[in-house]
Amino acid sequence: MPVPRSAKISMSASPYKQLEQEFKRLHAFRGALALLRWDAAVMMPRGSADVRGEQLAALETEHHALLTAPRIIRLLDRAQANTQGLADWQIANLREMRRQRDHAIATPVTLVSRLTKAASRAEARWLEARAQGKFEAFVPYLEEVVHLVRDKAALLGQALNLAPYDALVDEFSPGLTTADIDAMFKALSRRLPALIREAIIAQEGRPFLPLNGKFPAGKQRALVVEVMKAVGFQFDRGRLDESEHPFTEGVPGDLRVTTRFDPDDVFTGLLGALHETGHAMYDLGLPQEWRDQPVGRDRGMALEESQSLLIEMMVCRSRPFVRYVQPLIARHFGTSGPEWEVENVYGHLTRVQRGLIRVDADELTYPLHIMLRYELEKQLLSGELAVRDLREAWNAGMEQRLGIRPSNDLEGCLQDIHWAGGSFGYFPSYALGAVIAAQLYESMRAELAGLDEQLARGEFSGLFGWLRTHVHGLGAKVPVQELLKSATGKPLSAASFVRYVEAKYLETTASSAAA
């Protein structure tokens, strides 16, 4: 764990200490930007999108100007020329400072401002297009974002000596490239299609009862808050709200989690909130001593998504968790009867079906949703696919991969906000996250005796203690591959994920009873 900065060698006038102060200011800007984005999705009137875009652009421009100032590069050069006396965390912090600066300097401030404003407009129009159910209303706004992201990718790639799309991936998942992504998808493609068929056939032999009931949003919120508190979310340093698309925003010490409630399905809101709580617990577990420095941030979105998917999919869709949450649901909603017995609820949560909506997809079909988005966003950025043709390409891709076709745009190309916000290169982090989560979970289960019994009692301290030691507490100190080798003994591999889903969905081993 990091040594307290106050206990280190005094360097009050050193280049390194001056850099710490500069990046502390930048951290404050990040927090302000995060809260403005949260407010835009949760509280802001839709007609205020242009005003909010101006506010975001002003702060982004100032953040960019601070990060790319000549003073920063001079201090970085001087600090990295003489690292004698610096601790390993400080040296890693310098590396992350340089990385942030290199990414920022590659993108002109005018492009940063234009993209921020365009993304703010596009996100607002995405909401309107969803309300109308018409992709056409969104097309010109997405076209503008794609054009600007294409320019950004070209500049980033040139500066970082990466292919344009790899440069975008590197922003979200540092150190990972399309080569890693393609290798992962190749391994998954060899097994998943057949496994999906096998799992569907297997579950046909054990039909389950529908989970009928009415679940008022107020009572759902009370349930979600109770479970989030048990998991360890600190409501004095964060809050829960509703939004069109669940997300987590903010900085450690001020985290905002959202979910969406379905009056006919208690698990939509619960699992959505717990997915986001996985993100929040990662952020809360980051090294407090470095929370305002680059090295104290998460190690990228692939690792971030591994934490959310580990909680939502592997922990919360397990028999031990069902044993814990079943009586809570009964207490909040008065549910009873055979449909609410543990095995039936577990069958509901692990049902495999070829569905249209990514956020509602099961573990087996989920990677196929990501493969589609990965291919489409690469084609959009390369110019191979025009935005106006996205709907048909999406629908054809769904039919090819899952054998189903959207009947409307809400089931298809309007279901995700990521591209509206300019987050191209993000989607692969979901599949990478699932693979990383399985790798970590396999090692965790081998080391933690009695984990299932703890989860069944609603005790999560052992699970998060392991994650804090092997993931959260490391911040951005080491690359993802090094972290995985240390935690699991091997680099990124899809093998653990395949073993996990085979055991869980085909019940191929005795240990799968704990799944």
Question: Could you describe each region identified by the protein language model?
Answer:
Residues 297-338:
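Post-HExxH zinc-binding segment in Zn-dependent metallohydrolases
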Residues 4-174, 477, 502-515:
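A well-structured
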Residues 115-266, 505:
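Contiguous, non-catalytic segments that form substrate-binding/exosite surfaces or channel walls
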Residues 51, 111-114, 141-144, 184, ...:
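Secondary-structure capping and boundary motifs in well-ordered enzyme cores
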Residues 5, 9-15, 34-37, 41, ...:
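C-terminal, non-catalytic "cap/extension" segments appended to globular domains
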Residues 19, 157, 261, 265-288, ...:
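Active-site recognition of the HExxH zinc-binding catalytic motif
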